[in-house]
Amino acid sequence: MRTAFRLQFSAVDHGSKKVKNSPAFSHVEALAPASSANLGAGFDVFGVALGALFDKVSVDVVKVDKKVQLFVSGKGSEFIPTKPEKNTAGIVAEALLKASGKNCGLIINIEKGIRAGSGLGSSGASAAASALAINEALGLGFTDKELIKFAALGEIAAAGVPHADNVSASIMGFFTAIVSHEPFDVIRFPMPDNTKFVIATPEVIVETRKARSVLPKHIKLSDAVHNVARAAAFVAGVLTNNLTLIGMGMNDLIAEPYRASLIPGFFDVKKRALEAGAIGVAISGAGPSVLALVDSSKSMENRVAEAMKEGFEVNGIHCEVVIAKPGPGARIVRREEK
């Protein structure tokens, strides 16, 4: 049920930009935040950047003809492929290098701070940081929206098709909504100041491909109407600083009923979180992380965190809990000239 789109750049057409023949920097480092996609009713459309977990990507420009080398360290790095064509950051690197037309090579070092298979945009964060760092290093001048399209290509490695919900949030930050695929367009809005998310990540791995395979090929009209209404409530809540409306928008009838089976204890965790004061609860992305919305002005986050932890524990599952605010997108943290 992913919606793919075409990448409309080539080595000749750089979006009508003049690109320098030589790289701008020899070494660039970028950070990109974790993200939660879907957020309930916004399947494949909504995303939010989570200002608590990050991937770091370092790019070195070398005099090796159009070759990408990839190294991975950090959380779960032993399970992440280092062949560029099988890694989200590697796919992005090869696409940007081809688009640049430059006769150079790239050495990519990924430091994972976000566990793969957690539903927190781990692959998207690596792709986003890679896109931003390479754009800076090679002096390509692509805009954020253009970089999102390159980063979305990287998601082929994780999901089988390009998709932009996670990478949009990781690059642009805060709340993002994809409003068109052809032509591609995405909008960003800040969320209310009192927005906080409690994220419980159980020790369960859910691969995006697997989570997609359990989704129905056809949905009931009534379920589609429900989700459209709730998605509208979510956006209205963001625009009017109304957390109650945002919480309503986290109610999903299209993906959650099917993906919940991949997360032991999900409905127990959701029930306990709501009883503890959460305004809304949803599966984060493809799962298994569970995302709860809380009002930080009421100091409910620790109580909700404990409730979610207990919900998994009574089902025999250990989990890690993180509390995060919506945050800014990917950023450059270091540059070195030649």
Predicted regions and their residues:
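ATP-binding N-lobe of GHMP and related small-molecule kinases
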Residues: 5, 11, 15-118, 132, ...
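Glycine-rich beta-alpha junction loops
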Residues: 34, 52, 174, 201-206, ...
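A generic local secondary-structure boundary/capping motif
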Residues: 44-48, 156-161, 165-168, 184-190, ...
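Short beta-strand-to-turn element immediately C-terminal to the catalytic PLP-Schiff-base lysine
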Residues: 60, 170-181, 292-295, 333-335
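Short, conserved charged micro-motifs
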Residues: 65-68, 208, 298-304
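Gly/Ser-rich oxyanion-binding loop with an adjacent helix/lid
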Residues: 103-183
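Acyltransferase
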Residues: 193-271, 275
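Glycine-rich, charge-dense phosphate/pyrophosphate-binding loop(s)
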Residues: 238-338
